[in-house]
Design a protein with these regions (language model features):
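Carbohydrate-interacting regions of secretory-pathway proteins
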Residues: 22-230
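Bacterial Sec-dependent N-terminal signal peptides
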Residues: 1-25
């Protein structure tokens, strides 16, 4: 009995002293969202053939304006998303989550909150908004990144990580957590009310939806896209 008690105490101590991690610590299996060879698992916003998006060296590339936003075929609730992005000089794009479809919505950002992808140095949107909340890694028009130097310049690859779990979100950029944010509740409602999205019916109200990649008219690359549900 004494030995069992000692063993139990040791196990409790080991658990208590496990290192702290992101709240995405307990995870499911990683699933590749883009195989680098085809657009399997993706579709065009409002339907139709995927054009003006190409695949080059294992990356999906918006080659010219008019390709339209791309959505995952599947929908996700709580998840961890990882990808790499590279923006052209003066370019703009973004990644949205919990996107809803429907004729009443003009575009994915009508419903899906956006993590900004931008040439912070040269795109004018970088200098708009408030306190940097239009810069790369920001929760667009709501919360700025806490480190404006985390982003790499246009033409270089950046690594994004987005975690959504239990009403909370994290935006990571190149290994640094740059934004913590609620995804629901009074604090979220206040953030929306103080943003351009005030009064947008359906914006940020869903607990599940598509992942979307934005065509903002500028050349942009995405690769190594994977997700796991939490």
């Amino acid at each position: 009995m004494k030995k069992m008690f000692v063993l139990g105490a040791m196990l409790v101590a080991l658990v208590a002293f496990q290192p702290a991690e992101s709240f995405a610590q307990k995870k499911g299996k990683w699933v590749t969202l883009f195989d680098g060879k085809s657009f399997d698992g993706w579709k065009k916003w409002k339907g139709g053939e995927i054009t003006k998006w190409a695949i080059e060296d294992g990356a999906m590339v918006l080659t010219e304006k008019g390709g339209g936003d791309l959505l995952t075929v599947n929908q996700y609730g709580d998840f961890e998303l990882e990808l790499e992005w590279k923006i052209s000089e003066g370019g703009n794009s973004g990644v949205m989550y919990h996107v809803q479809e429907g004729e009443k919505y003009c575009c994915p950002y009508s419903t899906g909150p956006e993590i900004q992808v931008l040439d912070d140095a040269k795109h004018p949107d970088s200098f708009a908004g408030k306190d940097g909340n239009h810069k790369s890694g920001s929760l667009y028009d709501m919360l700025p990144p806490n480190d404006l130097k985390a982003v790499k310049p246009a033409g270089e690859w950046n690594k994004m990580r987005l975690v959504i779990k239990n009403g909370k979100g994290e935006s990571w950029l190149n290994g640094k957590k740059v934004v913590d944010f609620p995804t629901k509740g009074p604090e979220w409602d206040a953030m929306v009310a103080n943003s351009k999205f005030k009064g947008w019916n359906g914006f940020g109200t869903s607990d599940k939806g598509h992942i979307a990649i934005q065509d903002h008219g500028d050349k942009v690359w995405y690769r190594n896209i994977r997700i796991r549900e939490l």
